[in-house]
Amino acid sequence: MSFRINPLNAIDFYKADHRRQYPEGTEYVYANFTPRSSRLANMLHDFDDKIVFFGLQGFIQHFLIETWNEGFFNQDKATVVSHYKRRMDTSLGEGAVSVEHIEALHDLGYLPLKIKALPEGSRVNMRVPVLTVINTQAEFFWLTNYIETVLSAELWKSSTTATIAFEYKRLLTQYAVKTGASIENVVVQGHDFSSRGMSGIYDAAQSGVGHLTSFIGTDAVTAIDYAEQYYAASGVVGVSVPATEHSVMCMGSEENELETFRRLICELYPSGIVSIVSDTWDFWRVLSEFSVKLKQDILNRTPNALGLAKVVFRPDSGDPVKIICGDPDAEKDTPAYKGAVQLLWEIFGGTYTAQGYKVLHERVGLIYGDSITLQRAEAILQGLEAQGFASSNLVFGIGSYTYNYMTRDTFGFAVKATWGQVNGVGRELFKDPVTDSGTKKSAQGLLRVERSQDGFTLFDRQSKQQENQGELHTVFENGQLCLKSTLDEIRQRLAQQLESFKDSN
């Protein structure tokens, strides 16, 4: 029997009995999910302090609908209730948590919750809620914050990944504009290499779609599946190319490495793009010696249906900036001193952009996916520009150091209740710890979010009529997904917001 998540148990234990801890007569609890601070985020120096909101629709469909239906509502009531009681009894103590409210929820047959949210793909200012949630039936007031644990766990990562992916795209777009490179090429310049370093394959899928909001280059196969299933993705969702790994090169043996390259280039992949890991033994020898011997084979490869016939060399170790742009401390005029891009230029030549920056011959290219961060990517692009090369000469492999070296605290995401109703009377709730720096101070009361010149602005302490206005729209209500966005629509929203960065340096 395979392991399945019981949605009732997707909580922290302390949530189980909060129902009794609320004041007698509690009827409604209203909470929000908000990025509070970028203090711990390792972003670029000119980061504008906005996150990309993404991931809610997938969470709603996968967890709030599918998992709850399959794991609770569609199961025999006596069975699921007894399982829940056993879990509570064995960990919290016999009879510590009653089950009548769980039985009532099963009888109801759906989650009596309403979630309002900003459009996915919005870039949202810090301390502005991206969503609110409230129970729709007074009997189930406890349910709003019962789902806090899973809502937070499932949403912070997708938004954080999408935010970082957008930052890579912003950086690449700015350098494409500066050096006259093709803007259309940027969507393949960030390639997702992160799957093997993520927290499980589901995490790789879910996070990987965050990458796909800004790029189409990916090796995360499951991310495309997730995008198709939960975001109606169609057309070009994600693309990759044939590529080798070190085991392939090692099996070919060091003494036959040149022949391994030749076989890959001429026999296995005589057309299209092929990426070959090139530092299994001596990267500089591959570029300065092997590529010269294989030059005519490389130039004679046949373009595929897309007109592509490129051999991509992949270094996978060392200092990325020095490998690509050259090491000024190396012996002068050696391959290490010149760097990979300059070496390929000397061997294969190329063309120039309208701004006068060099573009490698269309038959060769580079991809670097080891130890890439936003800061290293920026340093490489600066180095290429200084050497007179366009930014399009390199593809960045973005790995788990970027997409998994983060936490919920990267952007301070938190779920907080700000309003409730007890015996028919509303109560404005807020926290403001005297021992805190101000980051944990919450909004207060019912909330409204409006568009502003700088993104979005929060208005708290709103009336019910005011709360119904603004940019937060109902996306989930009483077990149903009410409003859908496709991946294409999300990409378009982000692309529109990218326009303002094209003229900035």
Curated annotation (Swiss-Prot):
Catalyzes the condensation of nicotinamide with 5-phosphoribosyl-1-pyrophosphate to yield nicotinamide mononucleotide, an intermediate in the biosynthesis of NAD. Functions in the nondeamidating salvage pathway for production of NAD from nicotinamide. Displays a strict preference for nicotinamide over nicotinate substrate. The lineage of its organism: Bacteria, Pseudomonadati, Pseudomonadota, Gammaproteobacteria, Moraxellales. CDD domains: PBEF_like. Belongs to the NAPRTase family. The keyword Kinase does not apply. Disruption phenotype: The nadB-nadV double mutant can grow only in a minimal medium supplemented with niacin (nicotinamide or nicotinic acid). GO terms for molecular function: nicotinamide phosphoribosyltransferase activity. The keyword Cytoplasm does not apply. This is Nicotinamide phosphoribosyltransferase. InterPro entries: Aldolase_TIM, DUF5598, N/Namide_PRibTrfase, Nicotinamide_PRibTrfase, Nicotinate_pribotase-like_C. It comes from the Bacteria. It comes from Acinetobacter baylyi (strain ATCC 33305 / BD413 / ADP1). 10-fold more active in the presence of saturating ATP. It is an enzyme of class 2 (transferase). It catalyses: beta-nicotinamide D-ribonucleotide + diphosphate = 5-phospho-alpha-D-ribose 1-diphosphate + nicotinamide + H(+). Diphosphate binds at residues 196, 246, 314. Pathway: Cofactor biosynthesis; NAD(+) biosynthesis; nicotinamide D-ribonucleotide from 5-phospho-alpha-D-ribose 1-diphosphate and nicotinamide: step 1/1. GO terms for biological process: NAD biosynthetic process.
